[in-house]
Each structure stands twice: as structure tokens, then as C-alpha cells.
């Protein structure tokens, strides 16, 4: 198993999440909310991880199905673990497991929530919650593949691990271009 490449890809994915965590900071600044500070800690940790292990690509850079499965599983867990931190740090969801549930619900677009009054959240947290649903709607890993532009062979193994069903072999060769088109359409039609 190519653990160096797994670490490299995961750190690049976490680097993407660190950038996404900075968007609610801008929203907080626009609405003059102090709770936006809660996004800086996880974003800083993720940026540090990215610069420690996600910048230099390992010499042995091939991955196969087994590595793809490990990367997909760990990516879902790590994105949710770090994505839950702002809810807990801000104090609006003090129980970390509840915040984790809320974030997993967003990234998987299940629609479940532990919040009784979602609108009571500050705008930056409400934006982050909505962003997790938006990203999850198209698939976290497809989104990251579009942004990180891994080589086609490695992307194929990650896509096969992410996409369910027997038709995934037909999807994979054109998945990157299809995903870019879909995200372009989604951005164009979003009322964000």
C-alpha cells in the first residue's frame, strides 16, 4: 500500500477544506460576527497539514483500488471531523458529537439535523452548514478531484471508490470533465 501517496492526497483534500473554511470568515466579517473566529483554528490546522505533507508529491505516485478505498473512507471522516470544529468552538453546538453529526449530515446530504432552530445560528455558521450541503450534493470527493486535478489514473481509482453502482466504469473516463461542467452549471444557477 502506498501510504505516502495516501497521505499526500488526503493532505491536498484537507487543503481544499481549509480554503472552504475561510469563506465563512468573510461572511462573518460582512455581518460583523465574532463567531467567524471559530473557523480560523480548523483552517489553520488544515493549512499546516497541507504544507507539511501535501505540497511535495511522492516519487512513487501510483495508487490502485485499495488505496482509493482508504482515501475515500478517510476523506469523509477527516472532512467531517474538521468541518464540525467551528460549530463546537463557537459554542453554538457545544457537544462535539452533535456538531460532527450535523456536519456529516451536510456532507452526505441526508437532511437530518440536531438543531431545533437552524435560523438562530449566526450567518457565518448558517453559511457553513449550507455550504456543507451544497458540496455534499455533488459529492465531496468529486468536488475535491475537480479542484486538485490529480492525474487521470489516480482520479479513476478515487472515483471508482466514491461512485456507487455498476455503471461507474462508464463514468470514470469522462468524470473530471463531466464534474467540471456540472459544477459550472451549479455555480451558475446557485443563489448563493
Label for each model-derived stretch:
Residues 1-98:
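N-terminal alpha-helical transmembrane segments of multi-pass membrane transport
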Residues 188-192:
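Conserved small/polar residues in nucleotide/adenosyl-binding loops
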Amino acid at each position: 500500500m502506498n501510504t505516502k501517496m495516501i497521505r499526500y492526497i488526503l493532505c491536498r483534500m484537507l487543503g481544499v477544506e481549509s480554503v472552504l473554511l475561510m469563506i465563512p470568515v468573510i461572511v462573518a466579517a460582512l455581518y460583523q460576527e465574532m463567531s467567524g473566529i471559530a473557523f480560523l483554528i480548523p483552517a489553520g490546522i488544515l493549512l499546516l497539514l497541507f504544507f507539511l505533507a501535501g505540497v511535495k508529491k511522492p516519487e512513487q505516485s501510483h495508487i490502485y483500488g485499495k488505496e482509493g478505498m482508504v482515501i475515500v473512507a478517510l476523506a469523509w471522516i477527516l472532512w467531517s471531523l474538521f468541518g464540525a470544529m467551528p460549530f463546537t468552538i463557537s459554542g453554538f453546538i457545544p457537544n462535539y458529537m452533535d456538531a460532527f453529526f450535523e456536519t456529516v449530515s451536510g456532507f452526505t446530504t441526508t437532511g437530518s439535523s440536531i438543531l431545533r432552530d437552524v435560523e438562530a445560528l449566526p450567518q457565518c455558521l448558517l453559511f457553513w452548514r449550507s455550504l456543507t450541503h451544497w458540496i455534499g450534493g455533488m459529492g465531496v470527493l468529486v468536488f475535491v478531484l475537480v479542484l486538485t486535478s490529480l492525474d487521470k489514473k489516480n482520479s479513476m481509482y478515487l472515483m471508482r471508490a466514491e461512485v456507487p453502482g455498476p455503471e461507474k466504469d462508464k463514468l470514470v473516463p469522462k468524470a473530471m470533465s463531466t464534474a467540471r461542467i456540472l459544477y459550472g452549471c451549479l455555480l451558475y444557477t446557485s443563489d448563493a
